């Protein structure tokens, strides 16, 4: 798996190694072809706000945006990078805003590192065609997101690696409804 990280945010506390690790773990668990590529870019509030209005027609900053190279259907095989005959090698781009994520982490009672890991897994799922526009999609995507994130922490422990303690608070592994409540506290998120 080739994952490039670019930090254009100017924000302290962004752990490049951790974000590449969680992204690689999530994509590996989803059987994505090991030759697949993606990029994670950390940007500032102005940049994410500009992208948000340009691509989503929504004003203000947000936490994460994903730009898949190809439109994929979750679980489908034709043309996917995890198909027997590998599809496109470039999955796309995940754009994170650490400054916005810090606001969410503070409101949720956990670290910036955990919030960025959660947002990275969320972005990976979007790159693979998952979405949360319906209640059924929300349930599937947030369930898978939380499972992957929790399993990643277990994998880290098994490897003897620790980027930050696994949070145990009620907002650490939110379902869609819990995340919607957090978005009311920190307007603009909306993962």
UniProtKB/Swiss-Prot annotation:
The keyword Hydrolase applies. It holds the Pfam family YbeY. Its cofactor is Zn(2+). It is found in: Cytoplasm. Binds 1 zinc ion. Its EC number is 3.1.-.-. GO terms for cellular component: cytoplasm. The keyword Phosphoprotein does not apply. Keywords: Cytoplasm, Endonuclease, Hydrolase, Metal-binding, Nuclease, Ribosome biogenesis, rRNA processing, Zinc. Residues 176-191 have a biased composition (Basic and acidic residues). Zn(2+) binds at residues 122, 126, 132. Belongs to the endoribonuclease YbeY family. Single strand-specific metallo-endoribonuclease involved in late-stage 70S ribosome quality control and in maturation of the 3' terminus of the 16S rRNA. This is Endoribonuclease YbeY. It comes from Corynebacterium aurimucosum (strain ATCC 700975 / DSM 44827 / CIP 107346 / CN-1) (Corynebacterium nigricans).
């Amino acid at each position: 798996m080739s994952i490039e990280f670019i930090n254009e945010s100017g924000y302290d506390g962004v752990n490049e190694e951790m974000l590449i690790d969680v992204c690689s773990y999530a994509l590996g668990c989803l059987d994505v072809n090991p030759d697949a590529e993606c990029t994670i870019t950390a940007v500032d509030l102005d940049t994410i706000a500009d992208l948000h209005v340009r691509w989503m027609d929504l004003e203000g900053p947000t936490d994460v945006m994903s730009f898949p190279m190809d439109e994929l259907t979750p679980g489908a095989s034709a043309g996917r990078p995890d198909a027997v005959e590998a599809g496109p090698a470039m999955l796309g781009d995940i754009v994170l805003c650490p400054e916005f994520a810090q606001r969410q982490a503070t409101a949720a009672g956990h670290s910036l590192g955990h919030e960025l890991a959660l947002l990275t897994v969320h972005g990976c799922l979007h790159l693979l065609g998952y979405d949360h526009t319906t209640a059924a999609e929300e349930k599937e995507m947030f369930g898978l997101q939380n499972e992957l994130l929790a399993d990643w922490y277990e994998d880290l422990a098994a490897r003897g690696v620790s980027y930050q303690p696994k949070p145990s608070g009620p907002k650490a592994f939110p379902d869609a409804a819990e995340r919607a409540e957090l978005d009311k506290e920190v307007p603009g998120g909306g993962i």
